A protein has these predicted regions:
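Carbohydrate transferase catalytic cores enriched for Leloir-type hexosyltransferases
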Residues: 1-188
Length: 188
């Protein structure tokens, strides 16, 4: 079986999202000796930590690196929800997304990681305005709206949601209305 995993969030070193994703990928690759893995990475400016990746590479692991801006992927996958992930990484049986986007798939089953629902519970604590700095050529997205778009697709299309805590699982049931059998708690 081929399993694809979005590892783009590994660029956010020192965050809980990065630590959880790194532990999940490391554990899967150390314990699973049967399946092949395709790791998808995309970032316009940030670089992948190759010291971590070099420890994971082997005959069963392939890394696909792209340099798409996160706003483009948000538009393509969260807003208009086109361009299946298989067009970039090839055929996979399962695709695990992480924190920023929820791509469609052609045939692959979908799983995702749900860290929290702060965009619903405390939107004022999250960046909730779109801004552009023409001097630095920096675009700062509205994280609240982007996450809500992603979570719409999570609720309606994803087959399995890995929650990082029991509280996140309960929030997913209560706030998003996701059925309990689709939710699995995997602690950090």
């Amino acid at each position: 079986m081929k399993i694809g995993i979005d590892i783009s969030q590994l660029t956010h070193q020192g965050t809980g999202v990065e630590k959880y994703l790194k532990n999940l990928v490391t554990t899967l690759l150390k314990t699973d000796k049967e399946n092949d893995y395709i790791l998808f990475f995309s970032s316009l400016r940030r670089k992948l930590d190759y010291s971590f990746i070099n420890k994971l590479t082997g005959s069963r692991v392939e890394i696909k690196i792209f340099h798409f801006p996160p706003l483009l992927l948000d538009f393509i996958w969260n807003r208009i929800h086109v361009f299946p992930i298989e067009y970039l990484i090839g055929n996979v049986d399962i695709f695990i997304s992480s924190d920023w986007t929820q791509p469609p798939t052609l045939k692959a089953k979908k799983a995702t990681i749900l860290y929290d629902l702060i965009v619903y519970k405390y939107p004022e604590e999250t960046h909730n305005k779109f801004s552009f700095n023409p001097i630095k050529l920096l675009v700062s997205p509205n994280i609240v709206e982007s996450q809500k778009r992603r979570l719409f697709w999570v609720k309606n299309e994803v087959d399995l949601v890995f929650c990082i805590s029991q509280a996140t699982k309960e929030d997913a049931k209560k706030i998003l209305g996701i059925e309990g059998q689709k939710l699995k708690v995997i602690y950090p």
